[in-house]
Amino acid sequence: MPRSSRQQAGREAEAFALQFLQRQGLHLIEQNWLCKRGELDLVMLDGDTVVFVEVRYRRHSGWGGATESVDFRKQAKLVTAAQLFLQQATDWASHPCRFDVIAIEGQPGNAAPLNWIKSAFDS
């Protein structure tokens, strides 16, 4: 799949995940927050908890599923990016935090199975 098609599929998966989370009552703080250490796909608020959401999309699981792609190295990058986010967005620094993963396999929005893993890993 060409890079632009993969990027489009990734954007669609993020939009699908965002809509799902908003229907669950979460509120968007930031989307695609970039820093020198990486990117945070979605930063949401669930009650009083700041939730850093990694959205992983795989069209099929031939090379490993979406969930398995959030390995230890990726987790460490997300934790570092979240720390930098909280240093800059000081209003949220005193809130409890958690790391969730949204794993989507198939075509986003076309009855693709969405797996929401709350507290997928610890910092």
From Swiss-Prot:
<comment type="similarity">
    <text>Belongs to the UPF0102 family.</text>
</comment>
<dbReference type="InterPro" id="IPR011335">
    <property type="entry name" value="Restrct_endonuc-II-like"/>
</dbReference>
<dbReference type="Pfam" id="PF02021">
    <property type="entry name" value="UPF0102"/>
</dbReference>
<dbReference type="InterPro" id="IPR003509">
    <property type="entry name" value="UPF0102_YraN-like"/>
</dbReference>
<protein>
    <recommendedName>
        <fullName>UPF0102 protein PSPPH_4120</fullName>
    </recommendedName>
</protein>
<dbReference type="GO" id="GO:0003676">
    <property type="term" value="F:nucleic acid binding"/>
</dbReference>
<dbReference type="InterPro" id="IPR011856">
    <property type="entry name" value="tRNA_endonuc-like_dom_sf"/>
</dbReference>
